[in-house]
Curated annotation (Swiss-Prot):
NCBIfam families: PRK00823.1-2. GO terms for biological process: tetrahydrobiopterin biosynthetic process. The keyword Transcription regulation does not apply. InterPro entries: PCD_sf, Pterin_deHydtase. This is Putative pterin-4-alpha-carbinolamine dehydratase. Keywords: Lyase. It catalyses: (4aS,6R)-4a-hydroxy-L-erythro-5,6,7,8-tetrahydrobiopterin = (6R)-L-erythro-6,7-dihydrobiopterin + H2O. The keyword 4Fe-4S does not apply. The lineage of its organism: Archaea, Methanobacteriati, Methanobacteriota, Stenosarchaea group, Halobacteria. Belongs to the pterin-4-alpha-carbinolamine dehydratase family. It comes from Natronomonas pharaonis (strain ATCC 35678 / DSM 2160 / CIP 103997 / JCM 8858 / NBRC 14720 / NCIMB 2260 / Gabara) (Halobacterium pharaonis). GO terms for molecular function: 4-alpha-hydroxytetrahydrobiopterin dehydratase activity. Its EC number is 4.2.1.96. CDD domains: PCD_DCoH.
Length: 92
């Protein structure tokens, strides 16, 4: 199990485009089309499966909201920060 990060650690490490929402970090990725968003969600799901760390993803019209938390730790851990960074790279 991963250890929860402190508030200071979260603030220092949170990727720029992500926000904190309680015990989760969240980002809405925007795309040119609905299908581009679906493709991103599928690829992000593959990365999540590789990391064995599964986010909540909501697919909307030309956007995908991603929420990350570590349930067994009861909050935000390094796993969340690391996966957020991988999703950012995927979206570039």
């Amino acid at each position: 199990m991963s250890d929860r990060l402190t508030d200071d650690e979260i603030q220092a490490q949170l990727p720029a485009a992500w926000d904190r929402d309680g015990d989760e970090i969240v980002r809405t990725f925007e795309f040119e089309s609905y299908l581009e968003g679906v493709g991103f969600a599928s690829a992000a799901g593959g990365l999540a499966e590789e990391a064995f760390h599964h986010p909540e993803m909501t697919i909307g019209w030309r956007e995908v909201e991603v929420r990350l938390t570590t349930h067994d730790a009861g909050g935000i851990t390094q796993k969340d920060i690391d996966l957020a960074e991988r999703f950012d790279e995927l979206a570039e």
